[in-house]
Amino acid sequence: MERILNEEGEIRLVNLDPTIGAEIKKRRPCLIVNDDAVGVLPLKIMAPITDYKDKFQDVPWMVTLIPAQQNGLEKKCVIDLFQVRSVDEKHLVELKGMIGVDQLLSVKAALKVVFGC
């Protein structure tokens, strides 16, 4: 069976369950943060997207997304780069949209904060 390419910068609806404790749960939009050329397993590194709250405004690992036709989101959200995780491609449900290059650069900067790079 041929693999479907799921590319860096795509927003996909993903089933994140089961989870434990404070991990973000349920079926929700997530951002693919790894380049498809990296890795040999059918896994994607994902960052969950959650509802925007004012308290997230100055959090360095939260990247704000404004709803737009390109990203397929319906309300203001944030990408939570502190909750990045690998998921099997079978958890990916549907393509919602993409983020732009500037936002992808912000995501990479936030990942550097999270990983201390």
Q: Model features per residue range: what roles?
A:
Residues 1-117:
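Conserved functional hotspots at enzyme active or ligand-binding sites that engage polyanionic ligands
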